[in-house]
UniProtKB/Swiss-Prot annotation:
Gene3D superfamilies: Ctag/Cox11. The chain crosses the membrane at residues 13-35. It is found in: Cell inner membrane. Exerts its effect at some terminal stage of cytochrome c oxidase synthesis, probably by being involved in the insertion of the copper B into subunit I. NCBIfam families: PRK05089.1. The lineage of its organism: Bacteria, Pseudomonadati, Pseudomonadota, Alphaproteobacteria, Hyphomicrobiales. Keywords: Cell inner membrane, Cell membrane, Copper, Membrane, Signal-anchor, Transmembrane, Transmembrane helix. It comes from Sinorhizobium medicae (strain WSM419) (Ensifer medicae). One of its GO terms (biological process) is respiratory chain complex IV assembly. Belongs to the COX11/CtaG family. It is a single-pass type II membrane protein. Residues 36-198 are periplasmic. This is Cytochrome c oxidase assembly protein CtaG. Its main location: membrane. The gene is ctaG. Residues 1-12 are cytoplasmic.
Length: 198
């Protein structure tokens, strides 16, 4: 009898260990999947790591002073896209609203979806780089072989010349990286699948 009780305790103990390990693995996979969107959200809220600001209106003040803005494009592993700016750099007056274009093409034989993250260097300038319109605000799905032009409308906030850390900056780099994403399902589609299971 003593052996049976001890054996039951060992089985329960082993079950707890296995359950804990499985929960840990599932949690780590979930965190890995959520890391990019969570980090992106954190950076957008805080302006950390050169993240630009999203605005609804253009600047009222345009200075004579100019800044050179260079454009960078990257694609993360697992997303079979070509992605590049149409123009590598532009000289823009501080406060002037400008539109530039990036181009993406799906090299796969199936539809693929990506989401862009972005930053500005030098990092101190990120808080002064304001986007009015950007493809990075939503995920993008491209059909096989589809090519798409993606506009970005932005301005550099005139306040950049008043701050000690940023007033001497003459060149900014706007960089995008596209990451693979599972396409979002429309709410009606998710709801109908749930109802069918019930």
């Amino acid at each position: 009898m003593a052996d049976t009780g001890q054996s039951d305790r060992k089985e329960r103990s082993n079950g707890v260990i296995v359950g804990t390990c499985l929960a840990f693995v599932v949690g780590m996979v979930g965190m890995a999947y959520a890391a990019v969107p969570l980090y992106d959200m954190f950076c957008r809220v805080t302006g950390y790591n050169g993240t630009t600001q999203r605005v609804e209106q253009e600047s009222d003040l345009i200075l004579d002073e100019k800044v050179k803005v260079t454009f960078d494009a990257n694609v993360a592993a697992g997303l079979p896209w070509e992605f590049a700016p149409v123009q590598r750099d532009i000289d823009v007056r501080i406060g002037e609203t400008v539109q530039i274009t990036y181009r993406a093409r799906n090299l796969a034989s199936t539809p693929t979806t990506g989401q862009a993250t972005f930053n500005v260097t030098p990092m101190a300038a990120g808080a002064y780089f304001n986007k009015v319109q950007c493809f990075c605000f939503t995920e993008t799905t491209l059909q096989p072989g589809e090519e798409m032009e993606m506009p970005v409308v932005f301005f550099v906030d005139p306040e950049i010349v008043k701050t000690v850390e940023t007033k001497g900056i003459k060149t900014l780099t706007l960089s995008y990286t596209f990451y693979p994403r599972e396409p979002s399902k429309p709410v009606a589609q998710v709801k109908s699948r749930t109802e069918n299971k019930l």
